[in-house]
Amino acid sequence: MSSSNSPVKSTGSPFIQSLKPRDNLASMGSSTQLIIKDIGEIHSRLLDHRPVIQGETRYFIKEFEEKRGLREMRVLENLRNSISETNEHDLPKCTDVMQDQLASVLKKLETANHTIHRLQQRELETAKEIASRAGDQMMRAHWEPFMKEQEQRRRTVDEEHRKAVMRLKDQYVTMEKELSKQISF
């Protein structure tokens, strides 16, 4: 059995070795062929699990998708319920609280606006006062040299007037002397 030309090899039994080459089927009888075919089917059913695994995989995927769909439907239903509850109960409460708070915030805002308006008025008045003081100081700064110049001109005019008066007095005195000389003749 262990000779080199025996159908038995170290890889398996002679029956399995005879199954591997399909061209040996023609040399065997028809009953043997049917037996080998049945054994091949039994072998594929017992040892080849691919169709079973594929079927189980399809079944698992189908069940998973159904359960997932149901779970998602439950999640969506819960979400719809919570949204409708929020719309019916929480939203009106929030709206009422917001309206109440909005009124107080509006009053505070109006008060702050009025206060800021008063501060702006004060600031404007202060700026006008500062501008007025600056204008007054500038006017005084121009006024003092103007008054000094006017005083200088007045003195000059007074001096010229005094000199003119003195000339006229001298002239009248000389005229009177001449007149008195002429009258005495």
From Swiss-Prot:
**Entry GO terms, CC:** BLOC-1 complex; transport vesicle
Stretches assigned to coiled coil: 98-182
| Highest rank taxon of the organism | Eukaryota
TM regions (residue ranges): none
Listed A to Z, the keywords are: Coiled coil
Stretch list, region Disordered: 1-24
Q: Name the Pfam families on file.
A: Muted
Question: Biased composition, Polar residues: where in the chain?
Answer: 1-16
- InterPro entries under this entry? Bloc1s5
Instruction: List, alphabetically, the PANTHER family matched.
Output: BIOGENESIS OF LYSOSOME-RELATED ORGANELLES COMPLEX 1 SUBUNIT 5
Job description of the protein: Component of the BLOC-1 complex, a complex that is required for normal biogenesis of lysosome-related organelles (LRO), such as platelet dense granules and melanosomes. Plays a role in intracellular vesicle trafficking.
State the similarity comment. Belongs to the BLOC1S5 family.
Q: What quaternary arrangement does the UniProt entry report?
A: Component of the biogenesis of lysosome-related organelles complex 1 (BLOC-1).
This chain's protein is named: Biogenesis of lysosome-related organelles complex 1 subunit 5
**Classification lineage:** Eukaryota, Metazoa, Chordata, Craniata, Vertebrata
Gene giving rise to this polypeptide: bloc1s5
